[in-house]
From Swiss-Prot:
Gene3D superfamilies the UniProt entry points to: TusA-like domain
Organism: Pseudoalteromonas atlantica (strain T6c / ATCC BAA-1087)
Subcellular location field: Cytoplasm
Example GO BP: tRNA wobble position uridine thiolation
Active site: C20 (cysteine persulfide intermediate)
Function noted in UniProt: Sulfur carrier protein which probably makes part of a sulfur-relay system.
GO molecular function list: sulfur carrier activity
Protein's name in the database: Sulfur carrier protein TusA
Any single GO CC term annotated in Swiss-Prot or TrEMBL for this entry: cytoplasm
């Protein structure tokens, strides 16, 4: 799943240099402060995010709109769908 919409996100999160579980904790905190329907673009370089961020979205009911995990930094675009 790839997209060029990362720059159009309502919010940006730089998780580069952070290691598990910090990136997902930062994503969760960011999403808590967002309105329904807003988007969050994430940049990360911890390989565990390739598993953890999609799992977080499924578990919490948010949409992983796009991801680019072919090379670092990994990028994700999430839409907040649940309060």
């Amino acid at each position: 799943m790839t997209s060029n919409n990362f720059g159009d996100a309502n919010h940006q999160l730089d998780a580069i240099g952070l290691r598990c579980p910090e990136p997902v904790m930062m994503v969760r905190l960011s999403i808590r402060n967002m309105q329904l329907g807003e988007t969050l673009a994430i940049s990360a370089d911890d390989h565990s995010t390739t598993r953890d961020i999609p799992s977080f979205c499924r578990f919490m009911g948010h949409t992983l709109i796009a991801s680019d995990v072919d090379s670092k930094p990994y990028r994700y675009l999430i839409r907040k769908d649940q309060s």
